[in-house]
């Protein structure tokens, strides 16, 4: 629950948090709260400063750049595999995912919209036998997830949906070059909005 609140920006970057407040919020004892704080500190989602307190970490664009570099390296291989391995049933599942995304977007359901996005990418990795790769990505994606929340809540996401649709078309056509090209285009859409978010949410980002 604490990680969910951090990722979804219900707790803002820079906010001070205390064990007592979290115990009251979640209705649990200090021990699991303390353990969660230490784990999230290791994941760079919480900053701990002796004699100052515990704070929600700022969004680190350098860390996100490094994460996206790793993701692009993995997706170069995964998109190639998807063009070889995905069955008609796999393709149908991905197309239904896109339909569901559009439905949730129309109903302004941000949580389910983001869930569809995550499921789309996870499904491709798993269908290609790369569950472990996907786990590595998810374990390091929390900083990036906050950018996704900003993107989904403030930017028209029609182009993101089109990327997914075009990607499925490329998989179905076994067009490896096109699939990877679309994957890179998809990632760049988030990077393109960094400067806009820095202006709109200056207090969210690491200086």
Regions found by a protein language model. Name each.
Residues 8, 129, 172-173:
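Residues at helix-coil transition
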Residues 1-84, 195-207:
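Short linear motifs at protein or domain termini
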Residues 34-35, 39, 85-88, 112-115, ...:
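Juxtamembrane/interface motifs at transmembrane-helix termini
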Residues 176-207:
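C-terminal effector-binding regulatory domain of bacterial HTH transcription factors
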Residues 143, 148-149, 173-174, 202-207:
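Charge-rich, acidic-biased intrinsically disordered regions
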């Amino acid at each position: 629950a604490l990680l969910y609140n951090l990722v979804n920006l219900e707790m803002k970057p820079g906010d001070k948090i205390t064990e007592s407040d979290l115990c009251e919020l979640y209705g649990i004892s200090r021990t699991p709260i303390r353990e969660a704080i230490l784990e999230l500190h290791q994941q760079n989602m919480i900053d701990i400063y002796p004699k100052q307190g515990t704070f929600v970490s700022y969004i680190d664009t350098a860390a996100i750049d490094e994460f996206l570099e790793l993701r692009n390296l993995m997706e170069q291989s995964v998109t190639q595999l998807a063009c070889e391995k995905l069955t008609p049933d796999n393709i149908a599942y991905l197309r239904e995912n896109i339909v569901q995304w559009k439905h949730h977007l129309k109903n302004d359901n941000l949580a389910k919209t983001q869930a569809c996005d995550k499921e789309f990418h996870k499904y491709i990795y798993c269908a290609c036998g790369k569950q472990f790769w996907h786990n590595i990505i998810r374990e390091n994606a929390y900083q990036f997830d906050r950018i996704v929340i900003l993107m989904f809540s403030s930017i028209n996401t029609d182009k993101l949906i089109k990327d997914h649709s075009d990607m499925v078309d490329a998989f179905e056509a076994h067009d490896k070059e096109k699939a990877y090209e679309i994957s890179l285009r998809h990632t760049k859409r988030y990077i393109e909005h960094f400067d806009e978010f820095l202006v709109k949410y200056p207090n969210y980002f690491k200086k």
